[in-house]
A protein has these predicted regions:
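An acidic/histidine-cluster motif and surrounding catalytic segment
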Residues: 1-102, 106-288
Length: 288
């Protein structure tokens, strides 16, 4: 447990902190560096050079591409997926027991330092053995149940899944399984045609392997800037934003209801795999 008089320079959210950043987005890296400099819990962070989707073999060529309007969107999704894979591979190769993976456009929520300290203290005391924890999310997928109240009106929840992979912690036990299920550059277009995006795949599959937690409202959000995935400015997801772009806070459904709803949703997504396979085959014929 962190001593009451300790500073955040005495603690870290994970063994390693990795920031995914495209080479042609240095302004994002500069903004992250400015934000992270005074924060000890980001100390020793490392940059992961993101994969630019338009440079992946097969981009812009049949069968997957036929000069469609959304070609660059699909390239962004593929590059994002391979970038997260690259970060997890790095964490595994470093021998870390946990890794905090951040995208370069993150923004800290109000009362971040207080909530981060409380999160570390209470997570250390939590009996649940979790494998992944999302410090921010864009959209909830499935049920959630409250585990621990944190300072500043936040809480830690167990969740089925969520959309949003801009700030999350993975434990070492999940590394190999995730890497075995994420695509390589050679298979990424087939994978994307079926699963669309890494956060969608996480939302539907990660809780099959490990217990998934999330902090809500967001401990870490992200600011609005041009997205290489969406090819437009994204939503501003920070705790101060109470408008329509802010994610709805998670709600406790109770342990029994949580277990039952997770089983039902898992069965539904298992059936959806057939639809995913068919959609992938169709996109190979028509293009992404």
């Amino acid at each position: 447990m962190i001593a009451p008089d300790a500073t955040l320079s005495d603690c870290r959210l994970a063994d390693g902190v990795l920031v995914i950043n495209l080479d042609h987005r240095p302004e994002r890296m500069a903004q992250f560096e400015k934000m992270a400099r005074p924060l000890g819990l980001f100390q020793g962070w490392q940059r992961i050079a993101a994969v630019n989707g338009v440079d992946i073999p097969g981009y812009g060529k049949p069968p997957w591409f036929r000069n469609g309007k959304r070609d660059k969107c699909w390239a962004g999704r593929a590059g994002c997926t391979l970038s997260h894979r690259k970060a997890i591979e790095h964490a595994r190769d470093m021998g870390w027991s946990s890794v905090l993976i951040l995208e370069d456009d993150i923004q800290l929520g109000a009362g971040f330092e207080t909530s981060a300290r409380d999160f570390l203290n209470r997570t250390a005391a939590c009996a649940d053995t979790w494998g992944a924890c999302f410090l921010g999310l864009s959209k909830q997928v499935g049920p959630s149940r409250k585990l621990i109240d944190l300072d500043n009106a936040r809480a830690t929840y167990e969740i089925f899944g969520c959309i949003g992979a801009f700030a999350y912690i993975l434990k070492r036990e999940s590394f190999d399984w995730i890497l075995a299920n994420l695509p390589s550059p050679e298979s990424v277009w087939t994978w994307i045609s079926r699963h669309r995006a890494i956060d969608r795949w996480y939302a539907r599959n990660l809780s099959r392997r490990c217990v998934v937690h999330a902090v809500s409202p967001n401990l870490i959000g992200h600011y609005s800037s041009f997205s290489d995935i969406g090819q437009r400015a994204g939503a501003n997801l920070v705790i101060e934003d109470c408008g329509s772009n802010s994610h709805d806070p998670l709600r406790d459904c109770g342990k029994t209801a949580f277990v039952m709803r997770c089983r039902l949703l898992r069965g539904r997504f298992q059936l959806a795999r057939i639809a995913n396979e068919l959609r992938g085959a169709l996109k190979r014929i028509r293009g992404l």
